[in-house]
Amino acid sequence: MKGRAMTTSVEHHPTPQPAAPAAQIRETTPEERRRVRLASTIGTTIEFYDFYAYATAAVAVFPFLFFPKSESSTVALLSSFATFGLAFIARPLGSVLFGHFGDKIGRKATLVGALLTMGIATFVIGLLPTYAQAGIWAPALLALMRFCQGLGLGGEWSGAALLSTETAAKGRRAWAGMWPQLGAPFGFLLANGLFLILVTVLGHTSGDFEGAFMAWGWRVPFLLSIVMVIIGLWVRLQVEETPVFQQVEQNDQKAASPLAEVFKTAWKPLIQGTFIMVGCYTLFYIVTTWFLSYGIGSAEEGVGLGIAYPTFLKLQLVCIFGFMLGIPVAAHLADTYGRRPTLGLTSVAIIVYGLCFKWLLNPETFTMVSLGIFLFIGMILMGFIFGPMSAILPELFPSNVRYTGSGIAYNVSSILGAAIAPFIATALSSNYGPKAVGYYLVVVTAISLVAILTAPETKDQEMHEI
């Protein structure tokens, strides 16, 4: 019997293809990190210089040259502060605009646009006509340029923070993020130092509205800013895109609409980040902008201490070194012990500080020593609360919406903290004395403390894994 060949049918399936591996994060070199530190520090120094030049002029110049004469110096000052606050309204819009491009086309290119926006606006302020020359157009144009300043700064900080933290060495992210934070005291020193030189050389005194400083000298800091902008642009063009954003691009993880994605998936860190930062802003604008107006305000009218403007500027310039000292110390502590412990303990110290206003700023008993103590302690605390912010705020958001999310949190808090702080503090001190300003600081800082304690600790997380 002939045997039949037995055949076995084999079912063939297509061989599964492995998924394309996700792009690996690129390691940065020490030389690259040095270039990033330089670019982020110079850029934020220029931005804060521009901002502080306006803040100083908002107290010492603009109330008298850009607004109609008023019987009350407080009314003129509040009018000037109103334009000062316009930038803070513009800043969240700037964070949305520049954040969109920062999350879509990259951190580096977007930072160049932010620097140009603010730098050009600051230069134009130095060319504006006064109220006596142009009438109502003077404050209108001043307000427009201030708005443009806010747009630029709204995109600057978060981009500089991301440039630094997304290229940081392992375990040194707060330290890397500290460098753009140093732009704040550096810019303050440059702006106020230049104003001090001008008022000294040109012989300006409080109440002098006809001298060389008020005629043209105040314009010099604004016009000189264009030189720094050119330097800043050259430096920023030398850096590379961050490895974290390059990974987002290679893995095709970019959000179609970063703004919509933030509100859809990251609304909780958005709220937390906003309230974490609000106390920091309030403290800074109380101890700088409001304290300047209160210090040089008329003692006879009951709106200040009557200190000469050059004397007060010298005091501020000395005490700003406390700010510079606090930033790196706090960054080191945040990398060593964590963001929450560092920021939480600093917030408690700020609350205690706010309760001391009634003793240190008493118009009946104050001395230059007590004012120096008040300002120096405030600046140190400002450094401690501000230093780790460039680490904790970006760490709250995923890489594909980090520019937008951290920028909105940082800049919305500027409205709640900085924009209204000088205005509220001026009104409170005029009606209830400086102790009321201290209580205001206590309340806002307590709100920030709650946000800090409820936020996740991000010290040990990798940026590309968040």
What label would you give each PLM region?
Residues 55-56, 267-323, 417-421:
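Extracytoplasmic gate region of multi-pass secondary transporters
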Residues 58-91:
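Extracellular/periplasmic helix-loop-helix junction of adjacent transmembrane segments
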Residues 68, 116-135, 348-365:
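C-terminal ends and interior cores of transmembrane alpha-helices
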Residues 95-107, 326-339:
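Helix-to-loop junctions at the C-terminal end of transmembrane segments
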Residues 104-116, 336-348:
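Cytoplasmic membrane-interface "Motif A"-like loop-to-helix N-cap segments
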Residues 175-200, 410-421:
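Glycine-rich segments within core transmembrane alpha-helices of 12-TM secondary carriers
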Residues 232-239, 442-466:
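Multi-pass alpha-helical transporter architecture, strongest
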Residues 341-388:
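C-terminal transmembrane helical hairpin of 12-TM major facilitator-type secondary transporters
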